[in-house]
C-alpha cells in the first residue's frame, strides 16, 4: 500500500532505492479515488520535489478520471487549479477534444472556448523547449478542431526547427553516443526515433496535420531545408492521411 511505501522511504538512504520508492508512491497515490486519503499521504512526503510531483500526478489522474466518467464540466473546473502550465495546456486540449467528439453545437462551442484558454497560455514565438512543447500541444488540439489555425500556428516555427536540426547535426559530430545522425544525416528509423531531436517529439502533430490536409502538410514539409527532415515530415504527413480513423470535421471559424 502507499502507506507502507511511505513508511519504508524514511529507512532508505539517499540513493536510487529512495528515488524508485518515491516514484512507486507517486503512482500509487495517483490511483487513489479518495481525495482525503491522497491529501493525507501527499502531506506526509518529506521531500519537497517528490511531494510536488505526487500532487501534480494525483491532480492529473483525478482530472482524467472525472473526464472519463463524462463529468466534463467538473474536469474543466479542476484544470483551473493546476499549477504546472504545460500540464494545464495538455489537459485543456485533451478536454477540448472530448467535447468536440460529442459533436453537438454546444459541445463544439465548449471545445473552442477550451482551446482559446489553452492558446492564451502559450508563447506563439517559443523561446525555449517548454514554450515549444506548449505550442505544439495547442497545435495538436487545433489540428482536429480548427485545422487552418493549426497550420497557421505551425508555419512560423519551421525556421526555428530548421535551426535546431542543423545545430543538432553539428553537435552530433562531437558526441559518439549520439545515434540520431550518421555521417551528418538524420537516421529515419521506423520507430519514433530519438526524442532528443525535437522533430521526433512532434510526429503525432505532423500526422494530424496530414490527416487534416495532406497537400498543405506536404507544402509545409517543403519548407524544411534538410532533405532528411523533409522526407521525415512528408512520410509522417502521409501516414496521418492514410489512417483509417475518421478525418476531422470542420466547422465555423473559431472566434479569436
Where are these regions (language model features)?
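Non-catalytic tandem-repeat scaffold regions and their flanking low-complexity/translocation tails
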Residues: 1-256
Amino acid at each position: 500500500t502507499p502507506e507502507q511505501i511511505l513508511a519504508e522511504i524514511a529507512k532508505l538512504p539517499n540513493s536510487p532505492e529512495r528515488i524508485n520508492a518515491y516514484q512507486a508512491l507517486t503512482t500509487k497515490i495517483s490511483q487513489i479515488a479518495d481525495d482525503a486519503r491522497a491529501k493525507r499521504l501527499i502531506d506526509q512526503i518529506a521531500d519537497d520535489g517528490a511531494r510536488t510531483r505526487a500532487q501534480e500526478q494525483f491532480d492529473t489522474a483525478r482530472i482524467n478520471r472525472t473526464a472519463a466518467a463524462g463529468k466534463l464540466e467538473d474536469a474543466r473546473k479542476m484544470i483551473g487549479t493546476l499549477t504546472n502550465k504545460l500540464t494545464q495546456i495538455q489537459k485543456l486540449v485533451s478536454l477540448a477534444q472530448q467535447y468536440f467528439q460529442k459533436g453537438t453545437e454546444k459541445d463544439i462551442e465548449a471545445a473552442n472556448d477550451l482551446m482559446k484558454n489553452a492558446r492564451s497560455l502559450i508563447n506563439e514565438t517559443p523561446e525555449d523547449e517548454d514554450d515549444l512543447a506548449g505550442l505544439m500541444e495547442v497545435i495538436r488540439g487545433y489540428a482536429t478542431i480548427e485545422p487552418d489555425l493549426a497550420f497557421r500556428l505551425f508555419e512560423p516555427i519551421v525556421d526555428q526547427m530548421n535551426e535546431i536540426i542543423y545545430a543538432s547535426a553539428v553537435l552530433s559530430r562531437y558526441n559518439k553516443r549520439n545515434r540520431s545522425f550518421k555521417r551528418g544525416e538524420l537516421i529515419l528509423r521506423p520507430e519514433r526515433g530519438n526524442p532528443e531531436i525535437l522533430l521526433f517529439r512532434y510526429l503525432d502533430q505532423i500526422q494530424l496535420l496530414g490527416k487534416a490536409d495532406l497537400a498543405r502538410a506536404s507544402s509545409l514539409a517543403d519548407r524544411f531545408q534538410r532533405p532528411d527532415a523533409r522526407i521525415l515530415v512528408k512520410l509522417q504527413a502521409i501516414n496521418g492521411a492514410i489512417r483509417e480513423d475518421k478525418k476531422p470535421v470542420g466547422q465555423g471559424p473559431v472566434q479569436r
